[in-house]
Amino acid sequence: MNKKKLFPLALVPLAATSLQAQSNIQTGRTDKRPNIILFMVDDMGWQDTSLPFWTQKTHYNELYETPNMERLARQGMMFTQAYASSISSPTRCSLITGTNAARHRVTNWTLQKNTMTDRKNKQLAVPDWNYNGVSQVPGTNNTFVGTSFVQILKDNGYHTIHCGKAHFGSIDTPGEDPHHWGFEVNIAGHAAGGLASYLGEENYGHTKDGKPVSLMAVPGLEKYWGTETFVTEALTQEAIKALNKAKKYNQPFYLYMAFLPPA
């Protein structure tokens, strides 16, 4: 059996964090292309870790213990001049399309189709931003059309897995569905960025008969309903299952792991 290493990367830009984790995955492949795991951590500042992203540790670095991030940095690379938008959708739209918010013009969080999420202000005019998010195909108003790097990976032989928070496009637009972006497997990804409940006891925001209590109800985790399983644990278990299945394929894999709760 050949051991295949995941390329390590540590990236903490302001409010969002992406990590490309290192691990040894045993596969039967002779393909030398790397397996990739990319973590997107929600609402995490550049000082919200014991790993300093400045020339020296700050007071806030001392408040945290994140040994795994320190290990990733030692074994990989750190990028200290990166940028992320201050809220969810713009950052995730940038990641999936490779464009910044000034170009894709998704400048606030998205949810319902053709609905701005800006707070009303009598003193300010609301800009005509792309409140329907991003898409790979034209045809939806107020939507940026771009190419997904996940689609490129898939087209070049990668098995692609999405797990967790998507938040790329509004409800009933092509961009809301991770499959649209080239993911072959989608675990819990949909249009909403928040979640109705973190708890399996509350069916992650569904009633006992399976009806969502709000647009924030987390889909696809029915097997954990009624159990004492926090949503992070449920997503982790599903990601591990998807990776174990992917190891059986004669192709490299890409896992996008986007946990729902803030870090």
What are the residue ranges of the model-derived segments?
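Bacterial Sec-dependent N-terminal signal peptides
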Residues: 1-31
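Long, internal low-complexity/basic segments
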Residues: 23-34, 41, 46, 78
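Proline/glycine-enriched tight loop/beta-turn segments at coil->beta junctions
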Residues: 29-35, 248-253
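Active-site segment of extracytoplasmic enzymes that catalyze sulfate/phosphate-ester chemistry
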Residues: 38-39, 46-147, 152, 206-207
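Generic enzyme active-site microenvironment
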Residues: 40, 163
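Catalytic metal-binding/acid-base residues of hydrolase active sites
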Residues: 44-45, 100-101, 166-167, 260
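Formylglycine-dependent
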Residues: 111-159, 166-263
